[in-house]
Amino acid sequence: MVEADRPGKLFIGGLNTETNEKALEAVFGKYGRIVEVLLMKDRETNKSRGFAFVTFESPADAKDAARDMNGKSLDGKAIKVEQATKPSFESGRRGLPPPPRSRGPPRGLRGGRGGSGGTRGPPSRGGHMDDGGYSMNFTLSSSRGPLPVKRGPPPRSGGPPPKRSAPSGPVRSSSGMGGRAPVSRGRDGYGGPPRREPLPSRRDVYLSPRDDGYSTKDSYSSRDYPSSRDTRDYAPPPRDYTYRDYGHSSSRDDYPSRGYSDRDGYGRERDYSDHPSGGSYRDSYESYGNSRSAPPTRGPPPSYGGSSRYDDYSSSRDGYGGSRDSYTSSRSDLYSSGRDRVGRQERGLPPSMERGYPPPRDSYSSSSRGAPRGGGRGGSRSDRGGRSRY
């Protein structure tokens, strides 16, 4: 862009608008024969735009003129004289800054990419946190997901939950505030109670899954294997959410790879999707739902998240078979305990609920409140949430 224009062509900038071609020719003519004087004018007003091009017959004369006249005053203004560049010095000059500028955007992009690309995983991995809930979730899910799940449920609990919350915010803007806060609450809960009370944490997780869809998964997988399993079971729905909420196919994929990867390993993935989303999900809900109350059967069960899900999970788990069974055992234990708790809650045993449920409950309520996102689901969820809560 900045190649020199034809030899002997000088750019004269910073001209007084009163300076005309004749004046330029008079001033520069003394350095040698001038072939052309081109004063740039405004097309509409025909006034000088303050710069001109003077072409000398001899490049040597042009160099002399540039050396002598650069910085000199002409008609009261210090002028700039230098070899003209191809596009026209100004545009050329302007072009230079752009590179830095463009560099900046890339940077921005990079950041953005990191954020959104977080989904891609590794890259954002470092930055998920920075990037934002999303990337984090995704990243975790995608990059870290599978391993981390196994690796550091606890850490994850710590970490993912936040992620979860972040996502929940964005994901469910509806749950946004509620969801997010609750989620975070859940998270906190996670930090401690979750482990203590898998159920609640899970529930939170569930909530979040519902809310976040993703992070929950992460948290699941990370948090309790069972939960990850659950997640998986869930996963189908969350997946749906994710599609819906995130619309990130990548995250979806990540999940699949992540939480789902478990599924794949189990070979459940397919089953799951079929069962959970299809029947077992619902069926389990129904079976549970019946015990619980019809609402779950509706399919909103998710709102139950906690109880129905647990149950469902357990059932689906069983249905899923061995791997699941192994999980099941742990899961079921968690679940059973969770279930009991849940049952209690439903029954109206405030203590258990309060015990560590409260956050979850809040999260539920919040999620249910924020549920708008889910639409019907949301509604049922809220109902359910209300029920379970009260």
UniProtKB/Swiss-Prot annotation:
O-glycosylated. The modification Phosphoserine is found at S88, S91, S165, S174, S261, S329, S330, S332, S352. The keyword Metal-binding does not apply. Residues 58-390 are annotated as: Disordered. Residues 60-80, 194-215, 241-274, 338-347, 380-390 have a biased composition (Basic and acidic residues). Residues 323-337, 362-371 have a biased composition (Low complexity). Residues 109-120 have a biased composition (Gly residues). Transmembrane segments: none annotated. The modification N6-acetyllysine is found at K30. Homomultimer. Found in the supraspliceosome complex Identified in the spliceosome C complex. Interacts with KHDRBS3. Forms a complex with ILF2, ILF3, YLPM1, KHDRBS1, NCOA5 and PPP1CA. Interacts with SAFB/SAFB1. Interacts with ERAP1; the interaction is RNA-independent. Interacts with CLK2, KHDRBS2, SAFB, TRA2B and YTHDC1. Interacts with PPIA/CYPA. RNA-binding protein that plays several role in the regulation of pre- and post-transcriptional processes. Implicated in tissue-specific regulation of gene transcription and alternative splicing of several pre-mRNAs. Binds to and stimulates transcription from the tumor suppressor TXNIP gene promoter; may thus be involved in tumor suppression. When associated with SAFB, binds to and stimulates transcription from the SREBF1 promoter. Associates with nascent mRNAs transcribed by RNA polymerase II. Component of the supraspliceosome complex that regulates pre-mRNA alternative splice site selection. This is RNA-binding motif protein, X chromosome. The lineage of its organism: Eukaryota, Metazoa, Chordata, Craniata, Vertebrata. The gene is Rbmx.
